[in-house]
Amino acid sequence: MNQLVSICMPCYNAARYVGPALDSALAQTWPNVEIIVVNDGSTDGSGEILADYEGRGVKVIHQANRGQCAAANRAYGESSGDYIKFFDADDLLSPDFITQQMARLDGRTDAVASAEWGRFHDDNLATFKLNPQSVWRDMEATEWLVEAWSDARSMMQCALWLIPRQVLERSGGWDESLSLINDFEFFARVMCHSEEVLFTPGATLYYRSGITGSLSGQKSRKAVESAYHSICRGTGHLLARRDDPAAKRSCANVLQDFIYTYYPDHSDLLAKMETRIPGMGGSELVPGGPPKFHALRRFVGWKAARRIQRLFGH
């Protein structure tokens, strides 16, 4: 039976990208797909572009700007599918993406399907390169979180996942108080209400990088507070399910990475993170950075090296 899959897309000021994203959704080979786009108060002409797609079977809903999470929840609330894929308005899916993920799930309603991904830059797919990760395999769901967070470099982008409606009914929708890295908290919660992650080789997400003004690039106080709360809540979901040393260590590494990322700014949030890490057993995570940063930190320590890096902008 060809069960219905709902693609739920929030769209805010994505006029440059939403057409190709929807084209990739419309090109899916799975025969029973509905596409729901919520135009979240766009002011750049996205609404006019979306109007052209309504005649091609895309359901478009317009609302005043309420944020990405509210738009995703609205799209989900309007959906009817047995399986749900949340999809950003600036990325691309390979044509067999949903067909392959549905084959992996094979009717299961207690597991989620994951996928391959890679980045491309400057609207040029010739720059695309897969980014293999250790979690590209079938795994128990909470073990996926432990492994993905172990180096604090997890990729939890929404389009990677095909989620049974029954899982979402247990986990709940997107947290509308969050903006930056909202997917961290959401998918931690989804995983904690799933039994297994089934990896889907060949299902490829083309992740667009380098977009000026993108949500992931925001560094305002409000955005950083969102990242802080998303990390605290997301790690809390995992630790409520299991508190073994491996889980605690991975959570500590995620908190430590937040400190590395935002130091020396937002000192109050960094201090709060620092107080939580010892209770998780500590972190031995090394800060990320270019070769010059690592060479410098060996002599002056990571904090001084980060300040110098910020001062000179590289």
Task: Describe every region a protein language model picked out.
Residues R249-T261:
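Amphipathic alpha-helical repeat scaffolds of TPR domains
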Residues D122, Y260-S267:
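Active-site activation/catalytic loop segments of kinase-like enzymes and analogous catalytic loops
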Residues G202-I211, G217-P245, D265-G282:
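Catalytic core of nucleotide-sugar-dependent glycosyltransferases
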Residues F184-F187, I231, L255-F258:
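Hydrophobic alpha-helical core bundles mediating ligand binding, dimerization, or RNAP-core interactions
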